[in-house]
């Protein structure tokens, strides 16, 4: 049972997230041979003020 964790900055539409789940599931199914019913995709959306690169929060850019 593959479990795929995806972390993204917030701001994508529900349709984009739905497409992401479909495409990730397909890629895992194709590359691992896992049955798609056994593939779990977990999406975590992060607030821009909770994510920083090089000491600068994304919300401050």
Curated annotation (Swiss-Prot):
Keywords from the UniProt entry: Isomerase
> Any keyword Isomerase?
yes
Q: Does the keyword Transport apply?
A: no
The UniProt entry, under Gene3D superfamilies, shows: Macrophage Migration Inhibitory Factor
Q: List the CDD domains.
A: 4Oxalocrotonate_Tautomerase
In the Enzyme Commission scheme, what number(s) does this protein have?
5.3.2.-
Q: Which residues form the active site?
A: 2
Top enzyme class of this protein? Answer: isomerase
- Please name the GO terms that the record assigns under molecular function: isomerase activity
Homology family: Belongs to the 4-oxalocrotonate tautomerase family.
Name of this chain's protein = Probable tautomerase SERP0934
Q: Which organism is it from?
A: Staphylococcus epidermidis (strain ATCC 35984 / DSM 28319 / BCRC 17069 / CCUG 31568 / BM 3577 / RP62A)
């Amino acid at each position: 049972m593959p479990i795929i964790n995806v972390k993204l900055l917030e701001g994508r539409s529900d349709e984009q997230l739905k497409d992401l789940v479909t495409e990730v599931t397909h890629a895992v199914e194709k590359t691992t041979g896992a049955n798609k019913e056994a593939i779990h995709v977990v999406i975590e959306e992060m607030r821009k003020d909770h994510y920083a690169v090089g000491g600068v929060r994304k919300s401050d850019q």
